[in-house]
Amino acid sequence: MSARPILWDVDTQVDFIRPGGKLVVPGAEEAVPAMTQLVRFAHATGIVHVASADDHELTDPEISDTPDFVHTYPPHCLRGTPGAQKIDETAQA
């Protein structure tokens, strides 16, 4: 068996990327065109697109109304909310 490349897509979700998201990563929106190109290339060439998604409920220990941003964070990527969805540009086939 030979090694094959994969596209490893980590948590490209609305709450981390889009303006107004609950825990936006600085500069993430500017990286979306590059993400789009990577996903399109992977789909076109048969590269496997592996994706993770952050997933929380309000009762998770990481979620806090008074976050320390080390061990706790404000509510984000709450299961079933628009912010938990992958952005369209990184949607899997």
Region annotations inferred by a language model:
Residues 1-93:
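Active-site acidic carboxylates
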